[in-house]
């Protein structure tokens, strides 16, 4: 048997290491970029054939090709493989094929999925279960096959689900769906279909928890599992209360809108698993939200600073804005072909001043109209401008609305830069 790897990113690296231990086969790695010396040494030591700097027809000789999630469907090598009937799969699919689906909790959504995944892992672990945390969040799922776990909590991206043939699992949560990754997916409909793929594979004994607004995007009549929507009369959250199955519970703290949505969705899963929420609310007390997600940094001269660098879509930015009355907003990065006219219409009542830099400024600028705005060159200039146009009591919010790769290695580096500027300007930390 000959197994191919199209792209050699994090997930395919973990998959190859697993298969080298557990399967007799010949392996072939095809990577568009140049492989580093350490990677080449590893491949050569394990007699793994490879090519770099592009993909060739050698992949056609493989019985199965594992696709890295970031590979776009319209690439020439994918078109070639598909035209020849090649079997394509993913690291995620191999994992799901080798575990009890009842132990898997899959979480997806346009925004908030990392926080929800971390929260689900937190409450299960603190309850005493040996719980694996991974998927699109940190550790590739296949690494969990080397151990024994009570539960596997996985963040799932639309890319992973698109390339997985049959991602079946018993517990599935969809937080929200809005326009995103339209630079990767051929249409919004394809994006929605990818996100919801596991739901339509579930059977009557399974559980599907989802945001009610999804019913406007896709007919869910074909889903056979138990469907529980939230943001309904029975399941919703206010600033101080959680309502699950019509019963009220007091939240143990103050949370921004996005975090309340995560708490609400995860609490429903928890209720279905354990038939009570009192312990969930107690465990929630010591859950620490992830950085770069509505992270309150502190104050400078009475101005309040928030780092929301993880917000890489306009939907996420609107969610951040919903927590405030008027905001000095910093947006930057690479946009995702969203409807910026509609975004500006929805955001404008919340904006005291809009500061933009990076590629997204070119896409946003034609729509800002009479909104006070500035276009700057970089984060340093954006920070200075925010200080200049704000006054005591104002909120200064970094919520980029775009990917970071035009100027930063990732969203975390972008958020760290914003935090460094805050500290350099004498910010009083929380």
UniProtKB/Swiss-Prot annotation:
Annotated Gene Ontology cellular component terms: cytoplasm
EC number: 6.3.2.9
Keywords: ATP-binding, Cell cycle, Cell division, Cell shape, Cell wall biogenesis/degradation, Cytoplasm, Ligase, Nucleotide-binding, Peptidoglycan synthesis
Disulfide bonds: none
An annotated GO BP: cell wall organization
Keyword flag Ligase: yes
Residues binding ATP: 109-115
Family (UniProt): Belongs to the MurCDEF family.
Classification via HAMAP family: MurD
Localization annotation: Cytoplasm
GO molecular function, one term: UDP-N-acetylmuramoylalanine-D-glutamate ligase activity
Gene3D superfamilies recorded: Mur ligase, C-terminal domain, Mur-like, catalytic domain, NAD(P)-binding Rossmann-like Domain
Name of the protein described by the UniProt record: UDP-N-acetylmuramoylalanine--D-glutamate ligase
Biochemical pathway: Cell wall biogenesis; peptidoglycan biosynthesis
Domain of life assignment: Bacteria
Main location: cytoplasm
Catalysed reaction equations from the record: UDP-N-acetyl-alpha-D-muramoyl-L-alanine + D-glutamate + ATP = UDP-N-acetyl-alpha-D-muramoyl-L-alanyl-D-glutamate + ADP + phosphate + H(+)
Keyword DNA-binding: no
Function: Cell wall formation. Catalyzes the addition of glutamate to the nucleotide precursor UDP-N-acetylmuramoyl-L-alanine (UMA).
Family matches, as PANTHER family: UDP-N-ACETYLMURAMOYLALANINE--D-GLUTAMATE LIGASE (PTHR43692:SF1)
Underlying gene: murD
Pfam families: Mur_ligase_C, Mur_ligase_M, MurD-like_N, MurD_N
Transmembrane segments: none
